[in-house]
Amino acid sequence: MKKVVKVMLPVLFAATSFAQSTTVWHRIVGVITAQQIPNIVAGIASAIPWTTSGGNATVNFTQGIVTFVVEGLVLVGGNNSGTPGPVTSVRGTLVCNPGAADQVTRNTALVPLSSQGNAAFSGNFLGGAPPATCTNPLFLIRLDAGAWLATGAVREFF
């Protein structure tokens, strides 16, 4: 058993440090947080609770191309529950090495958010391509002012 552990541990850790060419998040899910409790991810606070009916995101690290689709991004609770409320635009944010001293973020341009909570983007990140090595990448849907509303889930590397 000890031999298996000695052989497998380096393999497991190496798998997370390889530079992937593409990362896909198969779902976009809303932030689950209590009112007035900042659910902080990579130093970025969340807003009030949101939900989605679907979505996905893809980042090609080699080409610096990002695409995302979010569907049904709406508030959960409050007077605007079930709608995007006053939010009319969102952006995608890639976070590389979250929480580490060498954390890097890359943002997309703002895109319109429909009254049904739908938005889509395809293009390049503002400020250049993401770093070649991006450990534990996170994908967030954010307000222009900075708070995150949703995150990529069910991540897969290619």
Region spans (language model):
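Short amphipathic, basic-aromatic surface patches that mediate peripheral association
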Residues: 72-83
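Extended low-complexity, serine/threonine- and proline-enriched intrinsically disordered segments
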Residues: 81-100
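Helix-rich interaction surfaces within compact, conserved domain-sized segments
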Residues: 100-158
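Structural beta-strand segments of beta-rich domains
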Residues: 64-68
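N-terminal segment immediately downstream of the Sec signal-peptide cleavage site
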Residues: 20-63, 155-158
